[in-house]
UniProtKB/Swiss-Prot annotation:
UniProt gene name: syd
Organism, scientific name: Idiomarina loihiensis (strain ATCC BAA-735 / DSM 15497 / L2-TR)
Function: Interacts with the SecY protein in vivo. May bind preferentially to an uncomplexed state of SecY, thus functioning either as a chelating agent for excess SecY in the cell or as a regulatory factor that negatively controls the translocase function.
Keyword terms, alphabetized: Cell inner membrane, Cell membrane, Membrane
Record InterPro entries: Syd, Syd_sf
NCBIfam families: PRK04968.1
Membrane topology listed for this record: Peripheral membrane protein
Protein name (record): Protein Syd
Compartments reported by the entry: Cell inner membrane
CDD domains, per database record: Syd
Gene Ontology cellular-component annotations: cytoplasmic side of plasma membrane
Highest taxon of source: Bacteria
Record family assignment: Belongs to the Syd family.
Main location: membrane
Length: 183
Protein backbone atom coordinates (compact mmCIF):
# COMPACT_ATOMS: atom_id res chain seq x y z
CA UNK A 1 0.00 0.00 0.00
CA UNK A 2 1.31 3.43 -0.96
CA UNK A 3 1.88 6.17 1.57
CA UNK A 4 -0.08 9.40 1.27
CA UNK A 5 3.08 11.17 0.11
CA UNK A 6 3.52 8.59 -2.66
CA UNK A 7 -0.13 8.99 -3.71
CA UNK A 8 0.19 12.78 -3.84
CA UNK A 9 3.45 12.57 -5.81
CA UNK A 10 1.96 10.00 -8.22
CA UNK A 11 -1.05 12.24 -8.85
CA UNK A 12 1.23 15.20 -9.50
CA UNK A 13 3.27 13.09 -11.95
CA UNK A 14 0.09 11.95 -13.76
CA UNK A 15 -1.07 15.56 -13.89
CA UNK A 16 2.19 16.83 -15.40
CA UNK A 17 2.17 14.01 -17.98
CA UNK A 18 -1.47 14.40 -19.01
CA UNK A 19 -1.80 18.18 -18.79
CA UNK A 20 1.45 19.46 -20.32
CA UNK A 21 0.32 23.10 -20.37
CA UNK A 22 -1.35 24.26 -17.16
CA UNK A 23 -2.91 27.64 -16.39
CA UNK A 24 -3.83 29.29 -13.11
CA UNK A 25 -4.79 32.65 -11.68
CA UNK A 26 -1.85 35.05 -11.69
CA UNK A 27 -1.29 36.97 -8.45
CA UNK A 28 1.72 39.20 -9.07
CA UNK A 29 2.32 39.98 -5.39
CA UNK A 30 2.94 36.31 -4.57
CA UNK A 31 5.97 35.82 -6.83
CA UNK A 32 5.08 32.13 -6.73
CA UNK A 33 7.77 29.57 -7.61
CA UNK A 34 5.24 27.73 -9.82
CA UNK A 35 4.77 30.65 -12.21
CA UNK A 36 6.01 30.36 -15.77
CA UNK A 37 4.95 32.41 -18.78
CA UNK A 38 2.47 35.16 -17.94
CA UNK A 39 -0.38 34.90 -20.44
CA UNK A 40 -2.24 38.05 -19.42
CA UNK A 41 -2.83 40.11 -16.26
CA UNK A 42 -4.95 37.31 -14.76
CA UNK A 43 -3.45 34.10 -16.16
CA UNK A 44 -0.10 32.36 -15.95
CA UNK A 45 1.31 28.98 -16.96
CA UNK A 46 2.44 26.93 -13.98
CA UNK A 47 4.65 24.00 -13.09
CA UNK A 48 4.32 22.27 -9.72
CA UNK A 49 7.24 22.37 -7.29
CA UNK A 50 7.83 20.85 -3.89
CA UNK A 51 7.41 23.19 -0.95
CA UNK A 52 10.81 23.97 0.62
CA UNK A 53 9.08 23.95 4.02
CA UNK A 54 5.69 22.36 4.61
CA UNK A 55 2.78 24.68 5.34
CA UNK A 56 2.74 24.98 9.12
CA UNK A 57 -0.55 24.33 10.90
CA UNK A 58 0.86 24.74 14.45
CA UNK A 59 -0.41 28.27 15.13
CA UNK A 60 -3.85 27.48 13.73
CA UNK A 61 -4.08 24.27 15.77
CA UNK A 62 -3.15 26.23 18.88
CA UNK A 63 -5.62 29.04 18.16
CA UNK A 64 -8.49 26.64 17.45
CA UNK A 65 -7.43 24.27 20.25
CA UNK A 66 -7.52 21.26 17.94
CA UNK A 67 -5.28 19.03 15.86
CA UNK A 68 -5.79 18.64 12.15
CA UNK A 69 -5.83 15.18 10.62
CA UNK A 70 -2.35 14.41 9.30
CA UNK A 71 -3.66 13.86 5.77
CA UNK A 72 -4.83 17.49 5.62
CA UNK A 73 -1.42 18.77 6.67
CA UNK A 74 0.35 16.45 4.25
CA UNK A 75 -1.86 17.40 1.28
CA UNK A 76 -1.41 21.14 1.74
CA UNK A 77 2.23 20.94 2.85
CA UNK A 78 3.82 18.94 0.04
CA UNK A 79 3.55 20.82 -3.29
CA UNK A 80 3.01 24.32 -4.62
CA UNK A 81 0.72 24.04 -7.63
CA UNK A 82 -2.32 25.48 -9.32
CA UNK A 83 -5.63 23.83 -8.50
CA UNK A 84 -5.89 20.41 -10.16
CA UNK A 85 -8.83 19.66 -12.47
CA UNK A 86 -9.58 15.99 -11.79
CA UNK A 87 -12.05 13.32 -12.76
CA UNK A 88 -13.31 11.09 -9.97
CA UNK A 89 -15.68 8.38 -11.17
CA UNK A 90 -17.12 10.60 -13.90
CA UNK A 91 -17.37 13.72 -11.74
CA UNK A 92 -15.23 16.81 -12.28
CA UNK A 93 -13.44 17.96 -9.13
CA UNK A 94 -11.12 20.90 -8.57
CA UNK A 95 -8.52 19.82 -5.99
CA UNK A 96 -7.31 22.90 -4.14
CA UNK A 97 -3.59 23.58 -3.96
CA UNK A 98 -1.43 26.39 -2.63
CA UNK A 99 0.68 28.40 -5.06
CA UNK A 100 3.03 29.99 -2.54
CA UNK A 101 3.62 30.61 1.16
CA UNK A 102 1.27 33.62 0.96
CA UNK A 103 -1.43 31.47 -0.62
CA UNK A 104 -0.89 28.93 2.17
CA UNK A 105 -1.63 31.63 4.74
CA UNK A 106 -4.79 32.54 2.84
CA UNK A 107 -5.80 28.87 2.87
CA UNK A 108 -5.29 28.69 6.65
CA UNK A 109 -7.57 31.73 7.06
CA UNK A 110 -10.25 30.05 4.94
CA UNK A 111 -9.92 26.82 6.92
CA UNK A 112 -10.37 28.85 10.12
CA UNK A 113 -13.66 30.25 8.84
CA UNK A 114 -14.83 26.79 7.79
CA UNK A 115 -14.02 25.24 11.19
CA UNK A 116 -15.73 28.09 13.05
CA UNK A 117 -18.84 27.66 10.86
CA UNK A 118 -18.86 23.91 11.60
CA UNK A 119 -18.63 24.60 15.32
CA UNK A 120 -21.40 27.19 15.21
CA UNK A 121 -23.62 24.70 13.37
CA UNK A 122 -22.61 21.93 15.82
CA UNK A 123 -21.46 19.73 12.94
CA UNK A 124 -18.49 17.38 12.76
CA UNK A 125 -15.36 19.30 11.78
CA UNK A 126 -14.24 18.87 8.19
CA UNK A 127 -11.69 20.65 6.03
CA UNK A 128 -12.43 21.41 2.39
CA UNK A 129 -9.87 20.16 -0.12
CA UNK A 130 -11.77 20.67 -3.34
CA UNK A 131 -14.85 21.80 -5.17
CA UNK A 132 -17.33 19.87 -7.25
CA UNK A 133 -17.45 21.88 -10.46
CA UNK A 134 -20.80 20.43 -11.52
CA UNK A 135 -22.71 21.92 -8.59
CA UNK A 136 -22.30 25.29 -6.90
CA UNK A 137 -21.57 24.93 -3.21
CA UNK A 138 -20.53 21.26 -3.32
CA UNK A 139 -17.31 20.73 -1.38
CA UNK A 140 -14.91 17.81 -1.26
CA UNK A 141 -13.89 17.54 2.39
CA UNK A 142 -11.84 15.48 4.79
CA UNK A 143 -13.47 14.46 8.06
CA UNK A 144 -11.01 15.73 10.64
CA UNK A 145 -11.56 12.77 12.99
CA UNK A 146 -11.58 9.82 10.60
CA UNK A 147 -9.69 11.18 7.58
CA UNK A 148 -12.50 10.02 5.27
CA UNK A 149 -12.94 11.98 2.03
CA UNK A 150 -16.52 12.96 1.28
CA UNK A 151 -18.91 15.44 -0.23
CA UNK A 152 -20.86 18.11 1.59
CA UNK A 153 -22.86 21.17 0.72
CA UNK A 154 -21.69 24.43 2.28
CA UNK A 155 -23.19 24.60 5.77
CA UNK A 156 -24.20 20.93 5.82
CA UNK A 157 -22.60 17.73 7.10
CA UNK A 158 -20.72 15.29 4.89
CA UNK A 159 -23.44 13.36 3.07
CA UNK A 160 -21.45 11.01 0.85
CA UNK A 161 -18.19 9.27 1.81
CA UNK A 162 -16.05 8.78 -1.30
CA UNK A 163 -13.13 7.01 0.36
CA UNK A 164 -11.91 6.03 3.80
CA UNK A 165 -8.56 7.68 3.12
CA UNK A 166 -7.13 10.54 1.11
CA UNK A 167 -4.43 8.29 -0.39
CA UNK A 168 -7.00 5.84 -1.77
CA UNK A 169 -9.14 8.68 -3.11
CA UNK A 170 -6.21 10.37 -4.84
CA UNK A 171 -5.19 7.06 -6.41
CA UNK A 172 -8.63 6.96 -8.08
CA UNK A 173 -8.53 10.54 -9.39
CA UNK A 174 -7.44 11.18 -12.96
CA UNK A 175 -6.24 14.46 -14.48
CA UNK A 176 -8.79 16.26 -16.61
CA UNK A 177 -7.28 17.92 -19.65
CA UNK A 178 -8.11 21.61 -19.94
CA UNK A 179 -9.09 22.73 -23.41
CA UNK A 180 -8.09 26.39 -23.13
CA UNK A 181 -6.65 28.87 -20.63
CA UNK A 182 -10.11 29.91 -19.41
CA UNK A 183 -11.17 26.39 -18.40
Amino acid sequence: MKTLEESIDALMTRYKENVPVRYTEYVEEWNSPIYGTVIDENTVEWTPCRQPEALNFDDLESALEMSFHQSIKTLFGRWYAGDLALDYQGHTISLLQTQSAEDGERLLENITGHILMKRRLKQPETVFIGLGSEDDGLLVTIDNQSGAVGLEWVGKEQHDVLSDSLAAWLDNCQPQVETDKNS
